[in-house]
Regions:
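Bacterial N-terminal signal peptides that target proteins for export
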Residues: 1-8
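Sec/Tat signal peptide C-region and signal peptidase I cleavage site
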Residues: 18-22
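OB-fold single-stranded nucleic acid-binding module
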Residues: 23-124
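Bacterial N-terminal signal peptides
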Residues: 8-17
Length: 124
């Protein structure tokens, strides 16, 4: 009986490894539109930024590869999490970055909400 339990645990463990890996595949900002609802790592150059301090939620927008208003992908940082990022609108501007999280859309533009600094990696 103990052997069957061990076998079941190992089977479940090895069956979940490919799923976890597949959920965090690396894609470009342009490819994000084809992965809505997926967890992924999206990479691109921060083309424009904006801190909307007078808007509800005080969002900061980091647009990858194309500047606003023609953005193709946005990293959204809410004001409640902003302190974890310093001044993201200046710290990340013009840098190559990758962000990991669930891809959603807002007004037709794919985005990932970054709640933790570790979600955004700078690539030089």
């Amino acid at each position: 009986m103990k052997g069957l339990r061990c076998l079941a645990v190992l089977t479940i463990f090895f069956l979940t490894i490919p799923c976890v890996h597949a959920q965090t595949k690396k894609i470009t900002a342009a490819e994000a539109k084809d992965h809505i609802g997926d967890r992924a790592t999206v990479c691109g150059k921060v083309a424009s930024t904006h801190y909307a301090k007078n808007s509800k939620g005080e969002p900061t927008f980091l647009n990858l590869d194309e500047p606003y208003p023609k953005e193709i992908f946005t990293i959204l940082i809410w004001g409640s999490d902003r302190g974890k990022f310093g001044t993201p609108e200046s710290e990340y501007k013009s840098l190559q970055v990758c962000v990991t999280g669930k891809i959603t859309t807002y007004r037709g533009v794919p985005e990932i909400v970054a709640n933790e600094r570790e979600q955004i990696e700078i690539h030089k």
